[in-house]
Amino acid sequence: LIYTTEITYRRDKEHLLLSLSEMQSQNSHNFGFHYDPYNFDSNPEKSFFIQALQSLNINPDDVEDIYFTGGVTDPRKTDFFVEYKGEDGDWHRYSPDFLVRRKDGRCCIIEVKSEFNRNHPLDGQNGLKAMAVRGWEKLNPDLLQYEMIFTSTDSVAINQLSKINDFLREGLNHDG
């Protein structure tokens, strides 16, 4: 299946767009950009992607690709989402921010959030969305890892990518 969509954004969010042409010189292995431009929700998401792309291009051998999955959430245009039961008792869809897939089939799902949301009952580290993805992780521990990155600034610190970089080099790590 091939889905097509038009990317729309508010004018005050234009700084959160990132195009393939902007990253071409830093992306010699052509990772990411399964649609163009990417329309990030926040500066930390954009910061994470740029840094992850740089890491992927340094160590590309085991990497299939990185996908920004948080920008297209319409179920008619994407088939990657996690269902979770909300506090209202109804089922809802959650589209995590990123998916990194290795050539051996192992995947790491990444969510980037503001530190403010760490304890949020829906979006937090132990929130309903995270628990739903961790349920997937438990079903497929040999193939799936889930990481949440919380930041109190407009960027993701380099050390916050350490678990993702370990995943790229060595595979899965379920230490927390």
Please place each PLM-identified region on the residue numbering.
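Electrostatic, structured charged patches in enzyme active sites and in nucleic-acid/phosphate-binding
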Residues: L1-G176
